[in-house]
Amino acid sequence: VGGVGEVDVHVGHVDAVVLVDDGQALVSGAGANGITLADAQQAAQRSNMRYDRDGDSHYDILSALQKSVRGSDPDAALHYLARLLEAGDMISAARRMLVIASEDIGLAYPQCAAIVKACVDSAFQLGLPEARIPLAEAIILMATAPKSNSAINGIDAAIADIRAGRAGDIPAHLKDTHYGGAKKLGRGLTYQYPHMYPNHWVQQEYLPEELRGAQYYEYGPNKTEQAAKSYWEKIKGPQ
């Protein structure tokens, strides 16, 4: 058999085995009747799903999974999840699902990340085949949930400023004051403790002087973020 060396099969004394290129036994049937055509076809089909995890097919399926969830298509998302599971790649599927929960659902449904994490944990405790159930639950939840990418957009905008050299000194009133001599250095002298004020908020500057007025976070149009925006507009004024 190509790729696995010599294989000595004595019909009637060993189980029938179908070997694939990676030398892994995919189909075995007890008895002396040999391998049927159906056995070989099934083994070949499953072998084709065992893609190179460092190759294009691996990333294509993960990409299609995330884009299907992002596009709110639960049927397509289930299809690509099934392809990953049938290829034996539950780990990559689970990792990508954790990313999707924060990147694509995000603040539109903040509880989603915790639910997906719980489903992923359950999947690893159960193992396949039962693991498919909580993973499917998580995929359907994300595909049918409201979407927001405001978190990834916000952090990427902040990182872009840092990488461009726009950082600046931390305002003195925000610096650590737990050590002796901190106040002599002017640290924390004018800090206002928000919990001492109505609605637990007081106007003060938090960004470095060089970034004064920078806005990284933009409220998404979903119900959850708009509720937060409305709440703070009543307290701070229009954002």
Show the residue positions of the predicted features.
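Conserved alpha/beta core segments of nucleic-acid transaction machinery
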Residues: Q42-Y51, E103, T144
